Regions:
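Transmembrane helices of ABC transporter permease
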Residues: 34, 38-48, 93, 158-212, ...
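Alpha-helical segments in transporter systems
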Residues: 26, 37-62, 83, 87, ...
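Hydrophobic alpha-helical segments in the permease module
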Residues: 86-98, 192-196, 265-279, 285, ...
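Juxtamembrane helix-loop junctions of ABC transporter transmembrane domains
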Residues: 10-21, 52-61, 65-68, 90-134, ...
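Cytosolic ends of transmembrane helices, especially the final helix of ABC transmembrane type-1 domains
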Residues: 216, 239, 263, 311-340
Length: 610
C-alpha cells in the first residue's frame, strides 16, 4: 500500500528542457500541472475530512439534546439509527479518511513533489553556461534549488489541503449555526470579516519581508559555503578573523531581515488573539441569551460553543498556514531569479550530432569579448589540419584559454564560425561536440567520488583492463594503490574529497591525464596539462602523451615553452590576435614575441611571463 501511494508521483520524469516561467503563478503551474490528479484527490479527502470534523460537534450537540430528554428503557431503541450512524462516522469513516489523507500527503506529495521539482530544476540549471556559475556562489545556487523545491511543495499542499479545509470547515459551521438559529451566525461572520481585514493588512507585508529574508539567507549560505570550499586559502593567509567578519556581516543582515519578518508575524498573532476573544465571548453570550429566551436548545449551545472554541484554536494554525504560504511563495520568488534564467548557450532546435572523421578545425574570423564592447579575441582566423599538433603561445591574457573555451562551446561567439570537419559547431549538439574532444586543464577539479568513478567519467563503458592500462600510461598506479580515505576505502575505491582536495596537484593531474587517455577522443586539448607535475614525472609520462597525441588533432597551451617546442606548429597570440606562426626554429630566427619569451625563460625569468 505504501509503495503504491509513493509511486503516484515519479521523482524522475522525462525532462523536456524548457525554461521554467519567470512569473510566480506560471512557475507553480509548470511544476504542479503534471501531478494534478494527486492534488485533486488530496483536495477531496480534505473536503470530506473537514465535513466529518464539523459533524463531530453536531453529534455532540445532538447527544446533549438526547440526554436532556426523559430517560427510558427504550432510549437506545429510539435513537439506534442516529447513534449507529455517529458510531460509524467516528470509528470507521473518520480513521479511513485520516489514513487516506495522510497517505496522499506524507507518502505521495511530500517526498514525491519536492524531489521531482528539485530534479527538474537541477536538470535545467546544470545546463547553464560557465558564466552563470562564475557569477554566483555555488552554495547559493544549490540552496535555491533545494529550498525552492521544498517551498513549492509546502505552499501547494497548504493551498490545496489546509486552505480548502479551512473554507469548508467554516462554511459548514455557518450552516449548522443557521440550522439552530440564524442569529448565531452573526459573531462568526463579524469575526470572518475582521480576520479578512487582518490578513489583507498583514499578509502582503509578511510576503515581502519573507522574500527579503530568503534572499539574505541565500547570501549567507553562499558566503559560508564559499569559505568552506576555499578553506586552504583561508588557512594559508591566516585571515580567519577577516573571514569571520565577512560571514558575520551576512548573518547579521539575515538576522535583521528575519526580525523584520517576525515583527509582522507577532503583530498579526496579537491582533488575532484579541479578535478571537470577542468571537468566543460574543458567541457564548448570544447562545445563552437565545437559550434563555427559548429559541435554541442546550445542544445548540454545546454545538456553538464547541465550534467557536475549535475555530479559536484553529485561528493560530490558520494564521501560520497563510503566513507560511506567503513565506514559501517568497522563497519560490527568490528561487525563480536564479532558476528561471534563459540558457545563454543552448542547442538549436535542428542541432545534429557532430561527426568527426579526420579532426580538422577551422576558426573563421571569430570575435568574442565576454559580452563587453571589445577585446579578448577579435577577428581571429586559424586552420588546424587533421592530425596536426599546434601549440598556443603568448603572455597571460592573450586569449589562449578563451580560444579553447569557444572551441568547446562553453561560450557562444559574438560573430564568426568554428568548423570541425566542415561542420559549424553552432549547429551540432553540445554533448556530441564535447564527446569528441579530450581536455586536460591546468586547474584539474575532480568529483568527490572514488578514483574509479572519476576515471570512468572519461569513458563510462571502459573495462577494468582498459582503465588500469590508462592509469599505467599516466604513471598513476603507484600512488593510487596506496590511497586510503576516511571511510577505509582503498585504491580505486578511495574517495578523493571535494574537488580532489585529498590528492596533491600532481596526483590530480595524472588522474586527469589517465581520464583523457581512457576517453581517447580524436581531438585533444592540453591547457597546461603538465604544469602541476615535477620534471621527473613530466619526463616519465611524456612518452605516454606522445602516444596519446598520435593520430589526433592537438591544441596545446603552455607557458613553459620547452613542453610544446616539438609541436608541428606554434601559434603566438597577443591581445586576442595571432601575431606569429611557425616552428620553434622559425620563430626564434624571426626574433619576435616568441623569441623574447623564449629568451626570458631560458635566461631564468620564467616567472615574468607566468
Amino acid at each position: 500500500m505504501f509503495r503504491w501511494f509513493e509511486s503516484l508521483i515519479p521523482v524522475f520524469p522525462p525532462v523536456d528542457g524548457r525554461m521554467p516561467p519567470r512569473k510566480v503563478l506560471p512557475f507553480y503551474l509548470h511544476y504542479l500541472r503534471p501531478v494534478w490528479p494527486v492534488l485533486l484527490a488530496t483536495l477531496i479527502a480534505g473536503l470530506l475530512l473537514a465535513l466529518v470534523e464539523v459533524a463531530m460537534f453536531d453529534y455532540l450537540g445532538r447527544i446533549v439534546d438526547m440526554v436532556a430528554e426523559q430517560p427510558g428503557a427504550d432510549f437506545f431503541k429510539r435513537h439506534a439509527n442516529e447513534l449507529g450512524w455517529m458510531l460509524f462516522i467516528t470509528v470507521i469513516a473518520r480513521p479511513i479518511l485520516v489514513g487516506l489523507h495522510n497517505l496522499l500527503v506524507n507518502q505521495a506529495i511530500v517526498p514525491g513533489l519536492s524531489n521531482r521539482s528539485r530534479w527538474l530544476m537541477h536538470n535545467y540549471v546544470v545546463r547553464q553556461s560557465l558564466s552563470f556559475f562564475q557569477n554566483d556562489f555555488a552554495g547559493s545556487v544549490a540552496n535555491r534549488v533545494m529550498q525552492t523545491g521544498t517551498s513549492l511543495r509546502e505552499s501547494a499542499v497548504q493551498m490545496v489541503d489546509s486552505l480548502w479545509y479551512i473554507v469548508v470547515y467554516t462554511g459548514t459551521a455557518l450552516y449548522l449555526f443557521a440550522q439552530a438559529d440564524w442569529r448565531l451566525m452573526v459573531p462568526l461572520v463579524l469575526w470572518l470579516l475582521a480576520y479578512a481585514v487582518i490578513m489583507v493588512y498583514f499578509v502582503p507585508r509578511a510576503k515581502e519581508r519573507a522574500w527579503i529574508a530568503s534572499e539574505a539567507r541565500s547570501k549567507a549560505m553562499g558566503r559560508i559555503v564559499d569559505g568552506y570550499t576555499n578553506i586552504p586559502t583561508l588557512k594559508l593567509f591566516a585571515h580567519g578573523g577577516r573571514e569571520q567578519a565577512y560571514v558575520a556581516e551576512s548573518i547579521q543582515e539575515l538576522a535583521v531581515k528575519h526580525r523584520a519578518q517576525t515583527r509582522v508575524t507577532t503583530g498579526m498573532d496579537l491582533t488575532i488573539a484579541i479578535v478571537n476573544g470577542f468571537l468566543i465571548a460574543g458567541t457564548c453570550g448570544l447562545a445563552l441569551w437565545l437559550w434563555n429566551g427559548g429559541h435554541i436548545t442546550v445542544g445548540a449551545i454545546t454545538l456553538a460553543t464547541g465550534l467557536v472554541i475549535r475555530i479559536h484554536n484553529m485561528s493560530g494554525w490558520i494564521m501560520w498556514t497563510i503566513n507560511g504560504i506567503f513565506e514559501d511563495i517568497g522563497t519560490v520568488q527568490d528561487g525563480i531569479t536564479t532558476i528561471a534564467q534563459p540558457l545563454t548557450v543552448q542547442d538549436r532546435g535542428d542541432a545534429v550530432p557532430l561527426q568527426v572523421t579526420r579532426g580538422g578545425v577551422q576558426f573563421q574570423d571569430i570575435h568574442f569579448h565576454y559580452g563587453k564592447k571589445g577585446g579578448v579575441i577579435a577577428g581571429l582566423d586559424l586552420v588546424v589540419k587533421p592530425g596536426e599538433k599546434i601549440g598556443l603561445v603568448g603572455p597571460s591574457g592573450a586569449g589562449k584559454s578563451t580560444l579553447v573555451n569557444v572551441l568547446l562551446r562553453l561560450y557562444d561567439l559574438e560573430s564568426g564560425r568554428i568548423l570541425i570537419d566542415g561542420q559549424d559547431i553552432a549547429y551540432v549538439t553540445q554533448e556530441s561536440l564535447r564527446q569528441q574532444i579530450g581536455v586536460v586543464t591546468q586547474d584539474t577539479s575532480l568529483l568527490h567520488r572514488s578514483i574509479r568513478d572519476n576515471l570512468l567519467y572519461g569513458r563510462p563503458d571502459a573495462t577494468e583492463e582498459q582503465l588500469r592500462a590508462a592509469v599505467a600510461k599516466a604513471r598513476a598506479e603507484a600512488f593510487i594503490d596506496t590511497l586510503v580515505d576516511g571511510q577505509g576505502r582503498r585504491g580505486y575505491d578511495a574517495h578523493v574529497g571535494e574537488r580532489g582536495v585529498k590528492l596533491s596537484g600532481g596526483q590530480r593531474q595524472r588522474i586527469a591525464i589517465a581520464r583523457v587517455l581512457l576517453k581517447d577522443a580524436p581531438i585533444l586539448v592540453l591547457d597546461e596539462a603538465t604544469s602541476a607535475l615535477d620534471s621527473e614525472v613530466e619526463a616519465a609520462i611524456q612518452d605516454s602523451l606522445d602516444e596519446l597525441m598520435g593520430g589526433k588533432t592537438v591544441i596545446a597551451i603552455a607557458h613553459r615553452l620547452s613542453t610544446i617546442a616539438r609541436m608541428d606548429r606554434l601559434v603566438v597570440m597577443d591581445q586576442g590576435r595571432i601575431v606569429e606562426t611557425g616552428s620553434h626554429a622559425e620563430l626564434i630566427a624571426a626574433g619576435g614575441l616568441y623569441a623574447r619569451l623564449w629568451a626570458r625563460q631560458t635566461g631564468g625569468f620564467v616567472a615574468a611571463e607566468q
